């Protein structure tokens, strides 16, 4: 069973997406704060992280960049999500190390498909080099 860490400060999002992912057979862990996101990754060792951009105590881009520097998390795929319409965010997400970017609101099936695609890339992932 694969583990997904959802990092978002929206309780409704965490509940709705968490229930859907659990129904698909995933183990789901949650975190609501950028300050605890890195420790949540190290503690739970998820197979993938779904990370919101706007978080208390920081932003998802900084969390993604921190994870890229940790040997224990450098190959963990990250999907960055946001409700912002800023057109620069998808490129910024990829530069921060994300494998995918989704704009809220999105269908839970779209997230599940994105997770499956990222996980299907296999265990031969190399640490993602930070884009310059």
Model-found features: residue ranges?
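Short hydrophobic/Thr-rich beta-strand motif most characteristic of the beta2 strand and flanking loop
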Residues: 25-32, 40
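The feature encodes the CheY-like receiver
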Residues: 14, 56, 86, 105
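Active-site beta3 strand of CheY-like receiver
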Residues: 44-50, 55
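Short amphipathic alpha-helix used as the core "switch/output" element in two-component signaling
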Residues: 39, 61-74
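Acidic catalytic/metal-coordinating carboxylates
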Residues: 32-36, 59-62
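Charged docking surfaces used in two-component/phosphorelay signaling
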Residues: 15-23
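Alpha4 helix (beta4-alpha4-beta5 surface) of REC/receiver domains from two-component response regulators
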Residues: 62, 85-102, 113
């Amino acid at each position: 069973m694969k583990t997904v860490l959802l990092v978002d400060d929206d309780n409704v999002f965490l509940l709705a997406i968490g229930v859907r992912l659990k129904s698909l057979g995933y183990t789901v862990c949650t975190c609501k704060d950028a300050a605890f996101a890195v420790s949540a990754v190290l503690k739970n060792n998820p197979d993938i992280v779904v990370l919101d951009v706007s978080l208390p105590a920081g932003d998802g881009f900084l969390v993604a960049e921190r994870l890229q520097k940790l040997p224990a998390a450098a190959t963990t795929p990250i999907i960055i999500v946001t409700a912002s319409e800023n057109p620069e965010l998808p490129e910024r997400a990829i530069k921060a190390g994300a494998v995918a970017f989704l704009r809220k609101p999105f269908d839970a099936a779209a997230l599940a498909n994105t997770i499956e695609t990222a996980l299907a890339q296999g265990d031969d992932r190399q640490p993602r080099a930070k884009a310059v």
